[in-house]
Amino acid sequence: MNEDDNDLDFQRKIQEAECDVVLSDTSKQQPTYNDGISGRTVAKKAYISKQSIRQAHYKCAFDETHETFLTNKGVPYMEGHHLIPCTSSNAELFWSKFKRNIDCVENIICLCPTCHRRIHFGSKEEKGTIIKSLYQKQILSLKTVGLDISIEELLSLYD
């Protein structure tokens, strides 16, 4: 399974996830990994992304006026995006450096499908514009849970 298929599968799991309790301290839970044919990946938890989307009231963090379609559950379809990309190398780095898990509520941004795809497949300039905006909105939450990263470091993770 390639990275794009893996992300689509994860977005599907987010839509199906149940999250009836408010999660806290998700950044303090040690990351877990899956070892597969395509290598080692972080075992991301869909219910954590679901909570981030709910907390954002199903609004795109880049532009709240962006509209999308309704899911079969009657809520706007939104996707969860890890601002600090949730790769195994990043997860290992942040755990070893800060003892923090990047698969946490504070690192997951609610995005409309168009903005989410733009971050992954857009031009470098478009990616930079969105990432800088999201960083400004999210940096205090990241620092609150011990995920300290500069905008330059963050942008380098998207190259």
Segments (PLM) and residue ranges:
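Mixed-charge, low-complexity interaction segments
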Residues: 1-13
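A detector for short metal-coordination/catalytic motifs
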Residues: 77-78, 84-159
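Intrinsic disorder/low-complexity signature
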Residues: 3-4, 17, 22, 79, ...
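Long, compositionally biased, charged low-complexity segments
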Residues: 10-17, 138
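Short, charged surface segments at domain edges that flank catalytic/cofactor-binding sites
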Residues: 14-75, 87-104, 149, 155-156
